[in-house]
């Protein structure tokens, strides 16, 4: 069983919507189309203002893995768009374009699209496609590689179409804010979504495959007097259909401790993943990372320990295997919105032990 690409449904729905729009526009008579144009012309008030940022990267890597040659590659080209409809309602969209394989074909994915209504500091409601609030990393770092210190995400937070084991993206609704009477130190998040699709089912593409919705709740503590410190935990649950249409109970517990300032970074995160099949078999796996960095002027050395331990018999993710890596690198920021990273990685995973690799990445924002 293999995971279905997490973005496939979004592309299909977008394509269907575009096709319907073209057909309706082509078949509408002038008499029916005119009122729509007039209504558009009669819109009053200032048009919403959009802020657009673009993120890009150019990568190079070489590894001791047999049959893999050193190569340059384009990273994700990320368009990040935000806008305010009024002082309480905002919109966020993130569109990523990336090359597919060794050819020049470009794949476009709608990674995030959210409409957020801010009631007050204690309650913000959002609907759309979002990054799930599992742990810290997935909510703090999105598709702009510029903001990440090392090259790439920890293995457990890999994106779905890169073999990730987590539901990184979901479509649904969420609520977040600060807990009253905690001096804004205690934050919460609650999410309800469709969950991740793991088994191919063309008839259910773009929809939840069963009636069970995923839920995720989290709490984090970030006291003002300890600037940069954040301690938190989250719990995710869903029921997934396997190839035999049997329910598999999926649970993800996460806990983290983070200290981040412009000059220093210490991050540690642990996740426990469990899958329980309909016949009562329980599979427990875990993953995590520890990361430190320190900036001296334009130069920032860093280290990351990255680990993913998965039993081969686990439903859906057993073929990912176990992985551990030690990563040592250096980041230099020669100018504002430009960064250059270089790192050495030593990896142990199924069938390949003590593999050495070097990578570089140029990141930029405009």
Where are the language model's segments positioned?
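A short secondary-structure junction signal
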Residues: 185-187, 199-205, 232, 243-244
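N-terminal periplasmic/intermembrane-space "pro-region" immediately following the signal or transit peptide
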Residues: 2-5, 17-64, 366
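Outer-membrane beta-barrel pore domains
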Residues: 64-67, 105, 114-118, 126-129, ...
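Small-residue packing motifs within transmembrane alpha-helices
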Residues: 11-17, 21, 228
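Outer membrane beta-barrel
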Residues: 38-196, 211-213, 220-227, 291-302, ...
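Interfacial loop-to-helix transition and helix-capping segments at the boundaries
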Residues: 204-212, 248-250
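Glycine- and other small-residue-rich loops at beta-strand/loop junctions that grip anionic moieties
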Residues: 164, 208, 281
């Amino acid at each position: 069983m293999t995971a279905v690409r997490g973005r496939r449904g979004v592309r299909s729905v977008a394509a269907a919507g575009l096709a319907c729009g073209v057909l309706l526009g082509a078949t509408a008579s002038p008499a029916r189309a005119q009122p729509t144009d007039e209504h558009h012309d009669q819109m009053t008030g200032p048009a919403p203002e959009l802020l657009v940022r673009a993120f890009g990267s150019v990568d190079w890597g070489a590894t001791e893995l047999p049959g893999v040659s050193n190569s340059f590659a384009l990273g994700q080209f990320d368009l990040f768009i935000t806008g305010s409809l009024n002082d309480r309602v905002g919109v966020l969209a993130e569109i990523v374009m990336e090359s597919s394989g060794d050819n020049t074909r470009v794949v476009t994915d709608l990674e995030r699209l959210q409409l957020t209504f801010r009631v007050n500091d204690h309650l913000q409601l959002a609907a759309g496609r979002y990054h799930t609030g599992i742990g810290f990393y997935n909510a703090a770092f999105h598709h702009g590689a510029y903001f990440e210190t090392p090259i790439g995400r920890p293995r457990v937070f890999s994106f779905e179409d890169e073999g990730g084991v987590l539901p990184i993206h979901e479509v649904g609704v969420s609520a977040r804010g600060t807990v009253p009477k905690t001096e804004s130190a205690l934050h919460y998040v609650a999410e309800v979504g469709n969950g991740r699709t793991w088994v191919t089912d063309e008839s259910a593409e773009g929809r939840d495959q069963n009636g069970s919705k995923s839920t995720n709740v989290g709490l984090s503590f970030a006291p003002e007097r300890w600037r940069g410190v954040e301690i938190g935990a989250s719990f995710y649950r869903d029921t997934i259909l396997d190839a035999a249409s049997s329910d598999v109970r999926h649970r993800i517990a996460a806990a983290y401790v983070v200290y981040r300032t412009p000059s220093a970074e210490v991050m540690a995160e642990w996740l426990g993943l469990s899958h329980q099949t309909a016949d009562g078999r329980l599979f427990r796996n875990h993953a995590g990372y520890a990361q430190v960095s320190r900036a001296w002027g334009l130069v920032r050395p860093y280290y990351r320990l990255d680990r993913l331990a998965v039993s081969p018999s686990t439903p859906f993710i057993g073929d990912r295997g176990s992985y551990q890596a030690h990563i040592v690198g250096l980041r230099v920021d020669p100018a504002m919105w430009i960064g250059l990273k270089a790192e050495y990685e030593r990896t142990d995973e199924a069938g390949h032990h003590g593999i050495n690799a070097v990578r570089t990445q140029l990141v930029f924002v405009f």
